[in-house]
Amino acid sequence: MYKRQELTREQAIQQILDELSPNDIVVSTTGMASREVFEYRAQNNQGHQRDFLTVGGMGHASQIALGIALQKADRQVWCLDGDGAALMHLGNIAINGSLQPKNLKHIILNNGAHDSVGGQPTIGFQVDFLKIAQASGYQHTSQAKTTQEIKNKLAKIRELSGLSLLEIRIKKGARENLGRPTLTPVQNKERFMKFLSP
């Protein structure tokens, strides 16, 4: 039996975004996570140019983030992944480890469920993402379960040079009134590309 998680994904994402710098790059996984990123930016008048929302691309966020990290080595790249998405393309962790981008910060929001497509259970709480990452060559791995732990871990990760993974244990579910992005994927891409330009 697994201990019930108290932190929501939305609380975790808000805490993450609060800790990032204006020049940091964010790639978020498909579904609820990207919707929560978009809504939080809108509510705080932060704009959406810093975030690439991986709409309909389950499992691909970390490889998109990897490509950006390799090309933008002078900037921090944060990948907001899900346990279901990470498990779907588990080889991505090995690829990240083999290429060793020092500026890639891989965050897995683990609620043990495919939350965006019906809430079916995953094996996210049975798999040890930290050990998989370590065996694949990630230099720094850690886990958080509270907003304070997220704050502390992110502060440490930011100062570390090297490929990092932070697993955040969360409960499944989302607000019933959670909105959807009001930008099209093409508009998101164009604003994001402009943000990446020198």
Language-model features and meaning:
Residues E10-Q14, E19, I25, E39-P198:
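Thiamine diphosphate
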Residues T29-E39:
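N-terminal glycine-rich anion-binding loops that anchor highly charged ligand groups
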Residues M1-Q5:
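Conserved small/polar residues in nucleotide/adenosyl-binding loops
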